[in-house]
């Protein structure tokens, strides 16, 4: 008797991946389920047991919150990654980590393949498959949902036929993905770019009408670009981000309504909630403004934009991403200090910043009697700075006279 091929499935506990377990078994595979917690608050024990109940031969659950925070979210923070100037890469950040864990489990289980539950029109199929092939080119990648092309009703009928539990929230019109860096939401009424998102589409943030009428002022401390404490209380990075989700979300900070250009060539309307991420990005940027020299500060946005594109496009495990990360690491050596932020009515407003590496010299900046700036030096500087345009003007006037 020939031995069954083994596949490791990225398992969420939802309908698609539960049906995928049974479908893959029918295709002749021994299915191992693998579920990660990257901060969405899943009941891992329940998910593990459900996978076994549906038919998986083994079920892994992995608490990856701190790894996600340190190795992935931190890169996004230090690079201020906002795809198309808006999207902090919530889902795009978790996909390479999930792919990494799938490969690790596959190698441990001596599996020949890995599988994911992505459809054929989203970005995630690209992110998963490119990442997996980058980490282990020998693994086969299966995409059951993309292959079976069932309608929702057909999928439910298949689940009922095989005794697969159907989630109680199946009637929700939305497609939601969440991790500690934020929450993404699409489908339903959100597919109409003119329609206002209903409050039911949000979860991490309060509507402005229900936010407090008095602000919360917090102090966020950074060490070499890493946020380490809030109001003097130190947290592991994953807990710090989740804490900021609570604090900033209570004030309605971090709602994003965005029509974005997908990697696969279509436009998609997405609603995001990223209270912690947006607060941290703003605070970190202000501390960089205080501690980076002008040339680095002016060049870094070019690297940031490219990093956002690389991550969005599924190229986390690429030489270009590694090179960009090397630049970022160098810029963070002196990004140490404290930033004071006011959270109020949908805004995270930076009100103060300080650092032992501050390049701001009050005696040079002041207009009082304590001014230490050499005003006479400005005359020679202006002459040399404007010399190229002055020479150009002289030459142009000579040409005009000749004409």
From Swiss-Prot:
EC number: 6.3.4.5
Pfam families xref list: Arginosuc_syn_C, Arginosuc_synth
GO molecular function terms listed in the Swiss-Prot or TrEMBL record: argininosuccinate synthase activity; ATP binding
Annotated binding of L-citrulline, by residue: 87, 123, 127, 175, 184, 260, 272
Cell compartment(s), UniProt: Cytoplasm
One of the GO biological process terms: urea cycle
Pathway the protein takes part in: Amino-acid biosynthesis; L-arginine biosynthesis; L-arginine from L-ornithine and carbamoyl phosphate: step 2/3
Self-association and partners: Homotetramer.
HAMAP family: Arg_succ_synth_type1
Name of the molecule in the record: Argininosuccinate synthase
Gene name of the encoded protein: argG
């Amino acid at each position: 008797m020939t031995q069954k091929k083994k596949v490791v499935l990225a398992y969420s506990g939802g309908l698609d991946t539960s049906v995928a377990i049974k479908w893959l078994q029918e295709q002749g595979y021994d299915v191992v389920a693998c579920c990660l917690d990257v901060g969405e608050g899943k009941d891992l024990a329940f998910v593990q047991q459900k996978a076994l109940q549906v038919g998986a031969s083994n079920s892994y659950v992995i608490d990856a919150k701190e790894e996600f925070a340190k190795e992935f979210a931190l890169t996004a923070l230090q690079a201020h990654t906002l795809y198309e100037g808006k999207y902090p890469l919530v889902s795009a950040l978790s996909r390479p980590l999930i792919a990494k864990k799938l490969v690790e489990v596959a190698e441990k289980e001596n599996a020949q393949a890995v599988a994911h539950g992505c459809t054929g029109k989203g970005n995630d199929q690209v992110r998963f498959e490119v990442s997996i092939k980058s980490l282990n080119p020998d693994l086969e990648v299966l995409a059951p949902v993309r292959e079976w092309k069932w309608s929702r009703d057909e999928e439910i009928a298949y689940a009922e036929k095989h005794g697969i539990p159907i989630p109680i929230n199946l009637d929700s019109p939305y497609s939601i993905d969440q991790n500690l860096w934020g929450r993404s939401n699409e489908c339903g009424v959100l597919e109409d770019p003119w329609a206002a998102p209903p409050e039911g589409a949000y979860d991490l943030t309060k509507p402005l009408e229900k936010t407090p009428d008095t602000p919360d002022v917090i102090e966020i401390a950074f060490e070499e670009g890493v946020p380490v404490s809030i109001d003097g209380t130190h947290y592991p990075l994953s807990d710090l981000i989740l804490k900021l989700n609570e604090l900033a979300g209570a004030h309605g900070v971090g709602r994003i309504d965005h029509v974005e250009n997908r990697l696969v060539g279509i436009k998609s309307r997405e609603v995001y909630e990223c209270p912690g991420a947006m607060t941290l990005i703003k605070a970190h940027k202000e501390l960089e403004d205080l501690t980076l020299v002008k040339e680095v500060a002016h060049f870094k946005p070019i690297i940031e934009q490219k990093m956002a594109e690389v991550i969005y496009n599924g190229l986390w495990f690429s030489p270009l991403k590694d090179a960009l990360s090397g630049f970022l690491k160098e810029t963070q050596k002196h990004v140490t200090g404290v930033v004071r932020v006011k959270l109020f009515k949908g805004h995270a407003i930076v009100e103060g910043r300080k650092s032992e590496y501050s390049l701001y010299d009050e005696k040079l900046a002041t207009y009082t009697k304590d001014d230490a700036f050499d005003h006479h030096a400005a005359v020679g500087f202006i002459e040399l700075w404007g010399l190229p345009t002055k020479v150009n003007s002289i030459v142009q006037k000579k040409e005009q006279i000749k004409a």
